[in-house]
Amino acid sequence: AKAKRSPRKKKAAVKKSSKSKAKKPKSPKKKKAAKKPAKKAAKKK
């Protein structure tokens, strides 16, 4: 029973980690995208 339970917990942990990793990279990308246009606008001015 323990052997059957552990793989399920590992799968759940993998799903949680994948979701957290997927969410974390998106926010920095949004921040970078917001910063880049501001820098370009400043250079044009």
Curated annotation (Swiss-Prot):
- Its domain of life reads Eukaryota
Q: Which GO terms describe its biological process?
A: cell differentiation; spermatogenesis
Location in or out of the cell: Nucleus; Chromosome
What keywords were assigned to this record? Chromosome, Developmental protein, Differentiation, DNA-binding, Nucleosome core, Nucleus, Spermatogenesis
Regions annotated as coiled coil: none
Record flagged with keyword DNA-binding: yes
Q: Where do the segments described as Disordered lie?
A: 1-45
What coarse category fits the chief subcellular location reported for this protein?
A: nucleus
Which molecular function GO terms apply here?
DNA binding
Q: What's in the GO CC field? A: nucleosome; nucleus
What further fact does the record state?
Answer: The sequence of component I is shown.
What is the role of the protein in this entry?
Involved in nuclear basic protein transition: histones are replaced by spermatid specific proteins which are themselves replaced by protamines in late spermatids.
- Supply the name of the protein: Sperm-specific protein Phi-3
What species is this protein from?
Mytilus californianus (California mussel)
